């Protein structure tokens, strides 16, 4: 073969190779376009791209709120991956809410996400049953009307010790975190287990202490690599204390559970079933064929009371009380409403009366908007692949959530969102403009504005869950205990507003103690002190 023939052959081959390469690139690009989108290439939000991720994980604690806000506005219609203190979460845009809101536990699980968030391997969190949430939804919430008098009765008893009588012009100094933990612990104990343990000091201390130690354990262990946690956790005093609380719960509850089961099996004619959460839990377990060991039920009761009842309600009450002191102009309109809805006095309050307190309800919602339990909500672990409406596939095992805090502060959805407007969620003009009666008289409501806070038909309650109000979650697995928590919160706060003057310790010039932000969580200042003075008047 001559040199010219070889040259011509190479030229033809070169042209073919170039053509094949062009076709190959086109096909690869076409396949990428046709393939379902994945989450592998979503943008990542971290404190600094110049720092190693173990440093970014530690910096998540003080800077998470600002990072979530920045990610939300930078990638508003896109998913982004956030480096957290112990891993990563995928923060989703609002356009995926409808895709996910109705999915059940087999597809996306709030229980598994909670277990992961709370480091369940080291904190005694259980996720083996939905009986707790089922009992709340099917038994507790429908029973609220008959439970309110019991809660009030217990609060009356508790107030005499935690809020003693004062002489005229005398102020007493109290830590509000301790005050509300005590009030909620005593009142909820009666609802949860009746007379058996409601005044048991060991139980009250254990339920409060467990939540405190859980928080410490999470903060310490999360930045530590997962393979080192089994070596570190056993040496933490907080894990020792949690283990003691679990052992105590089993020692106190197991005999009660066993005795109730024995009485039910023997059909003892002299036995009357208690009307409390523990009994409803046992009965529902029988109905659904899910008979749990007594020790396991004891642990569930500890987790329920410590985390779902006492801790969350205490945080809400602290924030709301701080907000009231910071904005005293709201006190008189609230007192007027409480007097109107409780004409026979607070001690004879009913569920219907507390539901009618729309101003207080709105104030609590606004307080929660400024200081939600967490700036991320709808935490779910994907249990099996989920395909979203635009073809994006969420693979099994990823942790997803929505930027609830940033959404609630978005001017697209809330008018003038950076201003605290305690009555913005009221519908009736006389309540909405209680601070400006001249506006209420003229009923100046802008019907053309479709933002949530001014839309006349928009859901507005403290416990209302919407696409822009996710303080209690969203969708099928929304917090079922929010109705009981809200009712207890309003019961306690209405008593304080009616019966007491309160202020920050340190005099008239004292300012609202700054919140404590730990990662996505926004806590009130737990060391702050308030001064209380009993009003010397009858109501």
PLM regions and their residue ranges:
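Cytochrome P450 heme-binding "Cys pocket" and the immediately downstream C-terminal segment
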Residues: 330, 452, 464-465, 476, ...
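Classical protein tyrosine phosphatase
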Residues: 313-336
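N-terminal membrane-proximal hinge/A-helix region immediately C-terminal to the signal-anchor transmembrane segment
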Residues: 2-132, 150, 468
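Conserved cytochrome P450 K-helix E-x-x-R motif and the immediately C-terminal K′/meander segment
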Residues: 62-69, 344-392, 398-411, 459-462
């Amino acid at each position: 073969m001559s040199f010219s023939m070889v040259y011509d052959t190479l030229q033809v081959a070169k042209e073919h190779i170039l053509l094949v390469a062009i076709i190959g690139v086109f096909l690869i690009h076409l396949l990428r376009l046709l393939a379902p989108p994945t989450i592998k290439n979503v943008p990542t939000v971290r404190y600094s791209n110049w720092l190693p991720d173990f440093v970014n994980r530690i910096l998540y604690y003080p800077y998470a709120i600002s990072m979530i806000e920045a990610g939300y506005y930078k990638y508003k219609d896109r998913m982004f991956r956030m480096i957290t203190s112990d891993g990563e979460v995928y923060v989703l845009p609002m356009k995926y809410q409808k895709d996910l809101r109705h999915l059940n536990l087999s597809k996306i699980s709030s229980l598994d996400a909670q277990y992961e968030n709370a480091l369940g391997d080291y904190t005694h969190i259980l996720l083996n049953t939905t009986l707790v949430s089922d009992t709340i939804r099917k038994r507790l919430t429908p029973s609220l009307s008959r439970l309110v008098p019991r809660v009030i009765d217990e609060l009356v008893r508790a107030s005499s010790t935690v809020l003693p009588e004062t002489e005229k012009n005398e102020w007493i100094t109290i830590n509000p975190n301790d005050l509300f933990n005590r009030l909620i612990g005593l009142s909820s104990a009666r609802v949860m287990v009746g007379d058996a343990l409601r005044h048991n000091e060991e139980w009250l201390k254990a339920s409060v202490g467990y939540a405190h130690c859980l928080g410490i354990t999470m903060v310490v262990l999360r930045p530590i690599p997962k393979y080192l946690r089994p070596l570190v956790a056993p040496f933490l005093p907080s894990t020792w204390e949690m283990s003691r609380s679990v052992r105590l719960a089993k020692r106190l509850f197991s005999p009660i559970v066993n005795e109730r089961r024995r009485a039910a099996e023997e059909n003892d004619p002299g036995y009357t079933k208690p009307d409390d959460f523990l009994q409803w839990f046992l009965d529902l377990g029988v109905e659904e064929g899910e008979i749990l060991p007594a020790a396991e039920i004891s642990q569930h009761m500890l987790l329920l009371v410590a985390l779902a009842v006492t801790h969350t309600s205490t945080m809400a009450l602290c924030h709301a009380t701080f907000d009231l002191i910071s904005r005293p102009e709201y006190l008189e309109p609230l007192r007027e409403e409480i007097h109107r809805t409780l004409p026979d006095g607070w001690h004879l309050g009913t569920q219907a009366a507390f539901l009618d307190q729309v101003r207080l309800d709105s104030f609590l919602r606004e307080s929660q908007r400024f200081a939600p339990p967490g700036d991320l909500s709808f935490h779910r672990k994907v249990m099996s692949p989920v395909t979203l409406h635009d073809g994006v596939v969420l693979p099994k095992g990823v942790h997803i959530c929505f930027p609830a805090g940033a959404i609630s502060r978005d001017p697209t959805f809330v008018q003038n969102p950076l201003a605290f407007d305690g009555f913005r969620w009221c519908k009736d003009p006389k309540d909405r403009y209680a601070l400006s009666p001249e506006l209420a008289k003229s009923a100046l409501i802008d019907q053309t504005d479709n933002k949530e806070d001014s839309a006349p038909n928009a859901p507005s309650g403290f416990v209302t869950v919407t696409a822009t109000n996710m303080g209690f979650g969203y969708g099928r697995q929304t917090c079922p205990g929010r109705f009981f928590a809200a009712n207890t919160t309003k019961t306690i706060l209405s008593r304080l507003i009616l019966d007491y003057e309160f202020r920050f310790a340190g005099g008239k010039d004292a300012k609202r103690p700054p919140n404590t932000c730990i990662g996505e969580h926004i806590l009130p200042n737990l060391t702050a002190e308030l001064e209380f003075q009993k009003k010397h008047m009858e109501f």
